[in-house]
Swiss-Prot record:
The gene is RPL23. The lineage of its organism: Eukaryota, Viridiplantae, Streptophyta, Embryophyta, Tracheophyta. Keywords: Chloroplast, Plastid, Ribonucleoprotein, Ribosomal protein, RNA-binding, rRNA-binding, Transit peptide. Two forms of the protein exist; they have the same N-terminal sequence and approximately the same molecular weight. NCBIfam families: PRK14548.1. It holds the Pfam family Ribosomal_L23. This is Large ribosomal subunit protein uL23c.
Length: 198
């Protein structure tokens, strides 16, 4: 049996259970609508249970509360997937264009570095007379093309062939054979290999 008082400001309800096996003999509810708070008292045959400051809004509409944790996770995932334009501009890697360095030639050898000194031995003098060739000690880094260009530019003669040899002591010797139109003996006098040269 249930009775309800028709009051707009306060509502009270009482319920009676006729089941003898139940421990609760009577239960009464009192609601205060303007304050949205209610006091629930349960009268039992053994114990008296009282709960104070019960939130009526939580009891009536528990499903209308937004799930803040899930909404926050969704918002964070959305921000991570679609960043703003400012963040996108700052997050892109910046590639700086460096100024190109000047490439210098690896071998910088002038004529005086390539042709170090003429070789004045009996075998070298014999080669001057017999094979129309000169012998020079040259730089180890100089190749045949560089030696040919150095002789042509420095002495003004045409070179027919260049042979090179590296000695056991690490120095490099060059056999420079001139064309037939040039005389190696006259060039040797100009250099100072033979006495009486200019």
């Amino acid at each position: 049996m249930a009775t309800t008082a028709p009051n707009l400001h306060s509502l009270s309800s009482s319920f009676a259970f006729s089941n003898p096996s139940s421990n609760v003999s009577a239960t009464s509810f009192t609601f205060q609508i303007p304050n949205k708070k209610a006091q629930i008292s349960c009268i039992s045959s053994k114990k008296l249970h009282t709960q104070k400051s019960f939130n009526f809004h939580d009891a009536v509409t528990p499903m209308n509360k937004p799930s803040f944790g899930r909404d926050l996770m969704v918002a964070q995932a959305t921000e991570a997937v679609a960043p703003t334009t400012e963040e996108a501009a700052t997050s892109q890697p910046k590639t700086s264009k460096k100024a190109k360095k000047l490439k210098y030639p690896r071998r910088i050898l002038d004529v005086y570095q390539i042709l170090q000194s003429p070789i004045i031995t009996e075998a070298a003098i014999k080669n001057i007379a017999d094979e129309n060739s000169l012998l020079f000690t040259v730089d180890v880094r100089a190749d045949k093309k560089m030696i040919r260009e150095a002789i042509s530019n420095f002495f003004g003669v045409k070179v027919r062939k260049v042979n090179t040899l590296i000695r056991p002591d690490g120095t490099k010797k060059a056999y420079i054979m001139l064309n037939k139109e040039y005389n190696a003996s006259e060039l040797a006098k100009k250099i100072g290999i033979f006495p009486g040269g200019n």
